[in-house]
Curated annotation (Swiss-Prot):
Designated gene of the protein: prsA
Descriptive protein name: Foldase protein PrsA
Disulfide bridges in this chain: none
Main subcellular localisation: membrane
Keyword Iron: no
EC number from the UniProt entry: 5.2.1.8
Signal peptide annotation: 1-20
InterPro entries, A to Z: Foldase_PrsA, PPIase_dom_sf, PPIase_PpiC, PrsA_foldase, Trigger_fact/SurA_dom_sf
């Protein structure tokens, strides 16, 4: 799946000028000259600094510097290059165009990848601190062990209803129906058979829920799944067998560990709280009133986290 390339927060010119302002105290260096007038760095800075895009680029730059100092040795150039090449291959011939549309050069995108990986590392380390018995037990309660099921995926609702009727008919050969009608390339040739538990990421949540609610050999009603783009697919699920759940959460410790870590690493509030803590520990001071609210989303997160303890 292609990972979306996020647009640069501000034009390269703005970034360069803002950076220059930070390094040149009170600079009135000309950046544009014309007949009878000039535009200085300080004039441009005064106009640009209140722009939301400029605010965002300064926030990104601050986060980059803070995480680079704290975790810079934890992310290698090789990791960054591998992630870059993965994106490049995913977009193919369109990669250069996608970068241009996002306002990014190749080097700027590599830098963005590196910053993301630094934050990901910090979030992972913070998530590991959440591996408590209490959280293991909570994850266990929500966990459903592996089931074996057969699925048929159909893109047309009318066709799906026809296949559903055939699948529920007495003596129906579900495996053959899957081979003849399913559009799911991973399971079609296997008669729709697939194994998964509640932590699986290769099966839609609605399909998992339908399977977990069935008895052996029962067939579900039509399950509708919509993509992020709103496109609907229709699933028919037959449960083949269930695995009996152990009464001891320790029996699933490795699996539950990944469940807990993944949940934290995908939780926006948790990620924000990690960034907030790093910014607080870095003792960030805002020297220009135009940027006084720059870190508000993180200071609020920090306050909320503290008050909830």
């Amino acid at each position: 799946m292609k990972k979306k390339i996020v647009a640069g927060a501000v034009t390269l010119l703005s970034v360069a000028v803002l950076a220059a302002c930070g390094k040149t105290s009170g600079s009135d260096k000309d950046i544009i000259t014309m007949k009878g007038d000039t535009i200085t760095v300080s004039e441009f800075y005064d106009k640009v600094k209140s722009n939301p895009s400029a605010q965002q680029v300064l926030l990104n730059l601050t986060i980059k510097e803070v995480f680079e100092k704290q975790y810079g040795k934890k992310v290698t150039d090789k990791e960054v290059e591998e992630a870059y090449e993965k994106s490049s291959k995913a977009y193919g011939d369109n990669f250069a165009r996608v970068l241009a549309q996002a306002g990014l050069t190749e080097d700027a995108y590599r830098e963005q990848i590196r910053t993301n990986k630094l934050v990901e590392y910090a979030v992972k380390k913070a998530a590991e601190k959440e591996l408590t018995d209490e959280n293991y037990k909570a994850a266990y309660e929500a966990y459903t062990p592996e089931v074996t099921a057969q699925i048929i995926k159909v893109d047309s609702e009318d066709k799906a209803k026809e296949v559903l009727a055939a699948a529920k008919a007495e003596g129906a050969d579900f495996a053959q129906l899957a081979k003849d009608n399913s559009t799911d390339g991973d399971t079609k040739d296997k008669g729709g058979e697939i194994k998964f538990d509640s932590a699986a990421t290769n099966v839609p949540d609605a399909v998992k829920k339908a399977a977990f609610g069935l008895e052996a050999n029962a067939v579900s009603d039509l399950v509708t799944v919509r993509s992020n783009q709103g496109q609907a697919s229709y699933y028919i699920v037959k449960l083949v067998s269930k695995t009996e759940k152990s009464s001891k959460w320790e029996d699933y410790k490795d699996k539950l560990k990944q469940v807990i870590l993944t949940a934290k690493q995908n939780n926006t509030s948790f990620i924000q709280s990690v960034v907030a803590k790093e910014l607080k520990d870095a003792n960030i001071k805002v020297k220009d009133a135009a940027f006084q609210n720059l870190f508000s989303q993180y200071t609020q997160t920090n306050t909320s986290s503290s008050s909830s303890k």
